[in-house]
Amino acid sequence: MDKIIKTISESGAFRAFVLDSTETVRTAQEKHQTQASSTVALGRTLIASQILAANEKGNTKLTVKVLGSSSLGAIITVADTKGNVKGYVQNPGVDIKKTATGEVLVGPFVGNGQFLVITDYGTGNPYNSITPLISGEIGEDLAFYLTESQQTPSAVGLNVLLDEEDKVKVAGGFLVQVLPGAKKEEIARFEKRIQEMPAISTLLESDDHIEALLKAIYGDEAYKRLSEEEIRFQCDCSHERFMNALASLPSSDLQEMKEEDHGAEITCQFCQTTYNFDEKDLEELIRDKS
């Protein structure tokens, strides 16, 4: 079971979120059949979306678009405040570029571009915020977005570790934010611990699992747990939703589908579920338009 734990330091000067998103990213890999670099890039963006959504309240939905200029194409994810996230990468077939330690690089395949966040509060007027991609490695891009767009100094870690067969072994992340009133010596202590922190994957694979992430962030400093919530890859597509999408097409297009294709087939980009609509479905839509 994937989860996110939200905490705040006893002094109230810092807050931290830690996430185990292994099943989330594993599900995304299975649904989209992504190759190594595509898996890591999509996985990191899914985790980034989970972090951002955890900062919201109510029925807010949050879309993250990593719009790079290189071979991965666009990465698009959508998360809500109930722990659900979905997403896809335009090119799922980008394979490996590894460092000497075996880490999969994604920056070269993302390229230059924009980090776009669309926040939908359900009012009909979504809020868009754009920052440039700093490295294309997603974590640094999210930290820059939070610092620049939300004016909150932030440290972010996102990690997707693959096994020898390039399947998701472990995935997770953290967010640490400086809150008003933080003292210089406190900031220095947190910065030092984060700089010296082992890889997220190493901590998640340890016996203490997600608790090891909290230990690495806080050290011996006291903190309060605010909440612990489940998170998951979950698409909200349905036959009815795509039926409504077809209903927005002109009658002439629906008539053409009926006569030439004897129906319609639509595959959800976010989860690869395929929905079929027969001639009767199309006839019903045409009739409703007349």
Swiss-Prot record:
Under oxidizing conditions two disulfide bonds are formed involving the reactive cysteines. Under reducing conditions zinc is bound to the reactive cysteines and the protein is inactive. Disulfide bonds join 235-237, 268-271. The keyword Oxidoreductase does not apply. Gene3D superfamilies: Hsp33 domain, HSP33 redox switch-like. Its main location: cytoplasm. Keywords: Chaperone, Cytoplasm, Disulfide bond, Redox-active center, Stress response, Zinc. It is found in: Cytoplasm. The keyword Zinc applies. It comes from the Bacteria. GO terms for cellular component: cytoplasm. Belongs to the HSP33 family. HAMAP family: HslO (MF_00117). Redox regulated molecular chaperone. Protects both thermally unfolding and oxidatively damaged proteins from irreversible aggregation. Plays an important role in the bacterial defense system toward oxidative stress. This is 33 kDa chaperonin. It comes from Streptococcus pneumoniae (strain ATCC 700669 / Spain 23F-1). The gene is hslO.
